[in-house]
């Protein structure tokens, strides 16, 4: 309630969301979101008896007191990020062990059912690495359009070429003229995006010059 200056005692929610038969359950990594209706959502990944990882979400409708999980979005996926692309519609953007490109799915019922997105396994290349995704409403950015912002190593082999991309059509396309290369050299590739103000997006990422780098980028430098 005070912008992170003080914190309550931690609460262990493992028993609420983890099936006892699973080997483990992890969040993101990255960030969670608050939906328009106040629902808290975090991306998750778990490994069950098949020993194959699965990405999904967990959510809370009471301010984090209790949490629930339904079904995974796609099997053989791990680190994911979630964004609300329309009121009540969540998009999960996933690291896919099949290599080559990101898996993307949407849900209208908090993960009870999932639909593969048209961009899945085609629009966003990756070297099998974590990525970041945020949704920004038109009223909250200088472009005056609902946008998605994405960052990852923009390659299919090796972790380099950390790039920020913007989609103006709900993630269907990520055009070359709406991208900005931040770091072309080898790095660990993880990143996390946030809006600083209406004109500027911030990115915390593992760069080639430091373990962690924070950079402020003007949206109009990405969308040309």
Question: Where are the predicted features?
Answer:
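Asp-box/BNR beta-propeller blade signature and adjacent active/binding-site loops
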Residues: 1-224
């Amino acid at each position: 309630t005070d912008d992170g200056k003080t914190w309550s005692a931690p609460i262990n929610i493992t028993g609420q969301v983890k099936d006892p038969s699973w080997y483990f359950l992890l969040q993101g990594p990255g960030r969670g979101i608050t939906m328009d209706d106040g629902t808290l959502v975090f991306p998750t990944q778990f490994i069950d008896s098949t020993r194959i990882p699965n990405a999904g979400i967990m959510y809370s409708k009471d301010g984090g007191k209790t949490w629930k999980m339904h079904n995974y979005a796609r099997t053989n996926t791990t680190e994911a990020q979630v964004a609300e692309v329309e009121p009540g519609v969540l998009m999960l953007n996933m690291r896919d062990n099949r290599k080559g490109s990101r898996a993307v799915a949407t849900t209208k019922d908090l993960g009870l059912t999932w639909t593969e997105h048209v961009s899945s396994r085609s629009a966003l290349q990756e070297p099998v690495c974590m990525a970041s995704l945020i949704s920004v409403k038109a009223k909250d950015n200088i472009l005056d359009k609902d946008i998605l912002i994405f960052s990852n190593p923009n390659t299919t082999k090796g972790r380099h070429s950390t790039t920020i991309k913007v989609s103006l059509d709900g993630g269907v396309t990520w055009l070359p003229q709406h991208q900005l290369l931040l770091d072309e050299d080898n790095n660990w590739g993880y990143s996390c995006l946030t809006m600083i103000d209406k004109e500027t997006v911030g990115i915390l990422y593992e760069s080639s010059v430091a373990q962690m780098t924070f950079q402020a980028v003007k949206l109009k430098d990405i969308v040309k």
